[in-house]
Structure formats: structure tokens, C-alpha cells
């Protein structure tokens, strides 16, 4: 099976290989003129930016290719085979050539657990060592919240990492969305939570002035986008009087949650739930109840966390803009916000139905739990994005709802 689709006669990506020399004056304390190598903009104007998503059939084939180009992965795989080969051969001799089922399950689990972690660690290590170049590309191309803006940055960094032997392929970022996500995880969030200059220098070293300029450029582009949502109102709902909240359709919220849990998105969690029941069948009633209850609570937790991760940055901006501009106050205000966002997220195909929020109470909880709570703690959490660029607007939304007079 061919993994990579050819783009030209030489089966090479159309990313230009020629570089040009350009000097950029950096602003900051004690920062002098420094030269960087960036890909010629004229080439990008005449040719389409090509990323791995245009060359590979899908994300899986790209990752499969990257894994087998990774020296760490090949070394780990060899050690794993050497570790289990003697046991495998002895099992074959002792049980009449029947493949040991438990050994197969164990090896599969080890691969599933360690392989993504190895790849993620390698990616993060490369980015951590290339913060200055990452920042320079952002300053040069000024990307905003639109994922399309990050295509040139991703293509440039893919070529730069390969040419400077920081990565062993030209396909470091699969697409622009991965580059945008890396910016948030490696630059925006870690740098923003640092409280003083000394801690920034300790963590980021000589890259601090470049990161500061990159974040300033991104902040400017983000503010332009926010004005579209908050002043020009790029979207306004129609016929809201015919929209009903799920609380009027379902008798209980529990029924609404169950419907969301038992859909295709959470099918793996449902399989895990059934596996818990099967494993605990002969372990006693108490153990069985604990396993079943734990599996169900896990599925509820996954459902709650799935909602914010399904929203893009533009959707979150629309959510905050809707809160700030809502005229109704109190519980009625949150009901109206829930109606508008249910319609918006359905029209934008973020959610499959107009049932994203159960009611106004659920909408208010969602805002407090996934937005305002992070503004209060300003600490990264594994199940919630920090939304650093939204902090000023989260605070404004909270103050708006607090200042609203009761009905």
C-alpha cells in the first residue's frame, strides 16, 4: 500500500527549498539585530503551500510513517521484541503452537500506552529547543485565530526542522491545526502563566524577547477578530421563539445525559463499561457495583469534557460575545444564551443537534467550570484548555452577568 501520494514527478512536496536571507530588527532589552532564514514569500505566492495532510491519505498513515522514521521507536520496538521473544517461543512449545492470548493482550497494551507518549515527547522536545525560530515565524506571518493562517508557518517550520536536522522528516506538523495547537501548548500557555520576568528567563532563556514579540503579534490579530464578534455581530439567530431547550423536551436531565453518552462518540467508553461488568461478574456484588458505577461516572465525565473540546476558538468567542451582549438578566438571561448557542453550534456543525446546553443552569455551569474557573486559578489542567487569549473577555462576561439586575 502506498502511503504517500506524489505531488510531482520526483515524488517530493511542492514546498520551495530555496531560502533567502532577511534581517529583522527585534525590539527588547539588549536585543540586537539578528538574521533569520525564512522561505521566500514569492514562492508561496506562486505555489500552494503543501503540508503532510495533502500528501498522505490520512492522519493515521502520516503517523505510521513518522513512527517508523523515529529512531527511538525502532529502538523501543527492538527491545520489546527481545524481551518477549523467549517467552513467546517457550509458550509455543508448551501449548502445541497455540498463540498465548494473554501475552498478545499485554504487548498490545504496551504498544498502545507507550507509543503515543514516545512520539509526543519527541515532538515537544524539538519544539522546546526551537522556540526562537517558532516565534520568528509567527512575527513574520502574523497568524490569527483562523487555522488557515497557520499553514505557511507550519510549512516553513517543517522545512526548517528538516534542513537543520532537528527532525528526521519534512512532515513535523501534519496540518496547520497541529501547528496552531503546538503554539498554544508550547508558547502561549506556558509563557502566560509565568508571573515574573525571572521565572520566564529561567524557563525560556534567550527566547524570551522573541516570544514576547510573537505573543504581541498574535494578540493584535486576535483583538481584530474579537471586534468582529463583539461589535459587528457576524452572526445573529433567527426565529428563536420556536427554539425549545432540552429541559422542555426531556423529562429529566439524566435522560438527556444518557442519550448523549450512548452515541457513537462515546462508543469506546461504552465498550469499557461492558468490559467492567464482564470482569467483575464473579468478584462479588460490591466489587461489581463499584466497577459498574465507576464506568458510568467515567462516561459522564468524558461527556462533560467533550463539549468544550468540540468548540473552536471562534465558537468560544461567540459564546462570550453572546453572554456580554445578552439583554435579559438572571435565569432568563442564561436561558436565552443557551438557546442562541444551541442554534449557533448546530448551524456551525459543532454539535449534531440543538441540544448542546440542557438549560440556562447548565449553560451557566459550563461558563463557570470551563471558562471563569480557569481565569481564577490560571493553572493548566489536563482536561481543560487555558484559553489565555480569552481571559480579558471572560472577566468582562463575568462582570456583565454579575452587574445584571435581578428580574
From Swiss-Prot:
Can you supply a Gene Ontology BP term from the record?
protein transport to vacuole involved in ubiquitin-dependent protein catabolic process via the multivesicular body sorting pathway
Instruction: Report the subcellular localization.
Output: Membrane
Alphabetized UniProt keyword annotations? Membrane, Transmembrane, Transmembrane helix
Q: What Gene Ontology terms describe where this protein resides (cellular component)?
A: endosome; membrane
Coiled coil regions in record: none
Q: Which InterPro entries match?
A: DUP/COS
**Chain segments annotated as transmembrane:** 75-95, 98-118, 261-281
Q: How does it sit in the membrane?
A: Multi-pass membrane protein
Name the domain of life. Answer: Eukaryota
Q: Which family does it belong to?
A: Belongs to the DUP/COS family.
The name this protein carries in UniProt is Protein COS9
Amino acid at each position: 500500500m502506498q502511503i504517500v501520494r506524489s505531488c510531482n514527478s520526483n515524488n517530493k512536496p511542492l514546498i520551495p527549498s530555496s531560502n533567502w536571507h532577511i534581517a529583522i530588527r527585534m525590539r527588547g532589552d539588549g536585543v540586537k539585530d539578528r538574521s533569520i532564514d525564512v522561505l521566500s514569500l514569492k514562492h508561496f505566492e506562486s505555489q500552494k503551500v503543501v503540508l503532510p495532510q495533502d500528501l498522505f491519505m490520512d492522519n493515521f498513515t502520516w503517523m505510521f510513517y513518522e513512527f517508523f522514521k523515529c529512531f527511538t521507536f525502532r529502538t523501543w520496538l527492538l527491545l520489546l521484541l527481545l524481551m518477549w521473544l523467549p517467552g513467546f517461543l517457550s509458550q509455543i512449545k508448551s501449548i502445541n503452537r497455540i498463540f498465548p492470548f494473554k501475552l498478545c493482550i499485554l504487548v498490545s497494551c504496551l504498544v498502545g500506552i507507550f507509543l503515543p507518549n514516545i512520539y509526543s515527547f519527541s515532538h515537544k522536545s524539538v519544539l522546546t529547543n526551537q522556540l526562537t525560530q517558532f516565534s520568528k515565524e509567527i512575527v513574520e506571518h502574523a497568524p490569527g485565530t483562523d487555522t488557515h493562517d497557520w499553514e505557511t508557518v507550519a510549512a516553513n517550520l517543517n522545512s526548517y526542522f528538516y534542513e537543520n536536522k532537528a527532525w528526521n522528516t519534512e512532515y513535523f506538523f501534519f496540518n496547520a491545526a497541529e501547528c496552531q495547537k503546538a503554539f498554544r501548548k508550547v508558547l502561549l500557555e506556558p509563557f502566560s502563566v509565568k508571573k515574573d520576568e525571572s521565572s520566564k528567563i529561567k524557563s525560556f532563556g534567550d527566547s524570551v524577547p522573541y516570544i514576547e514579540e510573537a505573543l504581541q503579534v498574535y494578540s493584535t490579530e486576535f483583538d481584530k477578530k474579537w471586534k468582529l464578534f463583539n461589535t459587528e455581530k457576524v452572526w445573529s439567530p433567527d426565529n428563536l421563539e420556536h427554539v425549545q431547550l432540552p429541559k422542555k423536551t426531556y423529562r429529566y436531565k439524566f435522560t438527556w445525559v444518557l442519550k448523549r453518552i450512548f452515541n457513537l462518540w462515546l462508543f469506546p467508553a461504552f465498550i469499557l463499561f461492558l468490559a467492567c461488568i464482564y470482569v467483575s461478574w464473579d468478584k462479588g456484588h460490591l466489587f461489581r457495583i463499584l466497577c459498574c458505577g465507576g464506568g458510568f461516572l467515567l462516561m459522564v465525565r468524558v461527556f462533560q469534557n467533550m463539549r468544550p473540546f468540540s468548540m473552536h476558538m471562534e465558537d468560544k468567542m461567540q459564546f462570550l460575545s453572546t453572554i456580554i451582549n445578552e439583554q435579559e438578566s438572571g435565569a432568563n438571561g442564561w436561558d436565552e444564551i443557551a438557546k442562541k448557542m444551541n442554534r449557533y453550534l448546530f448551524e456551525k456543525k459543532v454539535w449534531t443537534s440543538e441540544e448542546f446546553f440542557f438549560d440556562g443552569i447548565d449553560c451557566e455551569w459550563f461558563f463557570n467550570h470551563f471558562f471563569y474557573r480557569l481565569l481564577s486559578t490560571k493553572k493548566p489542567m489536563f482536561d481543560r484548555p487555558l484559553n489565555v487569549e480569552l481571559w480579558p473577555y471572560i472577566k468582562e462576561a463575568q462582570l456583565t452577568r454579575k452587574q445584571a439586575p435581578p428580574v
